């Protein structure tokens, strides 16, 4: 392809390391089943919380609901928690399971390169912990009254799957009690390396996620001067000081979702093997048909995916 920035409808200013985003991203306003909460004022991060629709919520409040801490996709550079594509997907999760979904509006690159998003993930985990401990003056009533802090899950899609993975590594070193992480859900997680895989080369000009666009996303997201063999991109590289070797101590179960039409599928299969070698019990749902992010666009596949997640939870 000619210009990956043209594909992304973005302009990068290398002097300021900022991105002008012209990509059309509609946002969805709040309704009675969603609310926005400030997470870190200094970092200008926030959370969008989803509950089941009112009529279903009234039925399910006789039992506590699982809490899903969710990280959206967008190559680390696009979208927010209120972006319609992410809002609708999280609302579907909250409705179908049912569950409380805490969607993290983390900082984007290149203005805030990795590990900024991982730091925001830690803030979100600590916020959920503080809710469980009742430490905050303005406790979030939905979590306080209806959330099951012993049944929490970390979930992410695409680059959000990468963030979810690294958040789980950091969680190993954290005292999260009373929060208990019951599992990790990685939906088409975004990883890479300098060495190309067969699926990388098979669909170089993939209509949804071309190779040149993936490379640019990593150039914008990774610390300056880093290659795609940085641990943030390539999980097979020696760990960055977090206890990835002890991952099974916290994350006993992991669901990896993928599609063979996704150019990232080889890396997702590699990730499954690595997690299994670390003692993590991994379940997979990998479909022959489908492309990167297809459940966000195809209602039928989304319904099937939600069924798999519900069974896992």
Curated annotation (Swiss-Prot):
Gene3D superfamilies per UniProt: alpha/beta hydrolase
One example GO MF annotation: hydrolase activity
GO BP field: alkaloid metabolic process
Active site: 158, 262, 292
EC number: 3.1.1.105
InterPro entries in UniProt: AB_hydrolase_3, AB_hydrolase_fold, Carboxylest/Gibb_receptor, Lipase_GDXG_HIS_AS
Pfam families: Abhydrolase_3
Catalytic activity, as annotated: 3-O-acetylpapaveroxine + H2O = narcotine hemiacetal + acetate + H(+)
UniProtKB keywords: Alkaloid metabolism, Hydrolase
Residues spanned by motif Involved in the stabilization of the negatively charged intermediate by the formation of the oxyanion hole: 72-74
Pathway: Alkaloid biosynthesis
Role summary: Carboxylesterase involved in the biosynthesis of the benzylisoquinoline alkaloid noscapine. Converts 3-O-acetylpapaveroxine to narcotine hemiacetal.
Family annotation (PANTHER family): ARYLACETAMIDE DEACETYLASE, CARBOXYLESTERASE 120-RELATED
Family per record: Belongs to the 'GDXG' lipolytic enzyme family.
The name this protein goes by in its record: 3-O-acetylpapaveroxine carboxylesterase CXE2
Provenance organism: Papaver somniferum (Opium poppy)
Lineage, top ranks: Eukaryota, Viridiplantae, Streptophyta, Embryophyta, Tracheophyta
Gene expressing this chain: CXE2
């Amino acid at each position: 392809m000619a210009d990956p920035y043209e594909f992304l409808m973005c302009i990068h200013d290398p002097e300021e390391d900022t991105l002008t985003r012209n990509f059309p991203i509609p946002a969805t306003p709040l309704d009675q089943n969603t609310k926005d909460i400030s997470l870190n004022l200094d970092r200008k991060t926030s959370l969008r919380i989803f509950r089941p629709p009112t009529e279903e919520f009234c039925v399910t409040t006789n039992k506590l609901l699982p809490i899903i801490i969710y990280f959206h996709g967008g190559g680390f550079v696009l979208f927010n928690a209120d972006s319609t594509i992410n809002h609708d997907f999280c609302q579907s999760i909250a409705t179908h399971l049912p569950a409380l979904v805490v969607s993290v509006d983390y900082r984007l690159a290149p203005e805030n390169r990795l590990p900024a998003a991982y730091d925001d993930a830690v803030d979100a985990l600590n916020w959920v912990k503080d809710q469980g401990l009742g430490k905050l003056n303005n406790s979030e009533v939905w979590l306080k009254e209806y959330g099951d802090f012993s049944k929490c899950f970390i979930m992410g899609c695409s680059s959000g799957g990468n963030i979810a993975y690294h958040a789980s590594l950091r969680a190993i070193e954290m005292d999260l009690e009373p929060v208990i992480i019951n599992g990790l859900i990685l939906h088409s997680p975004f990883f890479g390396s300098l060495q190309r895989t067969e699926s990388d080369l098979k669909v170089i000009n993939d209509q949804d996620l071309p190779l040149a666009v993936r490379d640019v996303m990593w150039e914008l997201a990774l610390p300056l001067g880093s290659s795609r063999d940085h641990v943030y991109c390539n999980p097979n590289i020696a760990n960055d000081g977090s206890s990835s070797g002890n991952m099974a101590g916290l994350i006993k179960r992991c669901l990896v979702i993928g599609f063979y039409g996704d150019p990232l599928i080889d890396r997702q299969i590699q990730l499954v093997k690595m997690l299994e070698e670390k003692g993590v019990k991994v379940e997979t749902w990998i479909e022959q048909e489908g492309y990167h992010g297809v459940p966000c666009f195809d209602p039928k596949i989304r319904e099937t995916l939600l069924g798999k997640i519900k069974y896992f939870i």
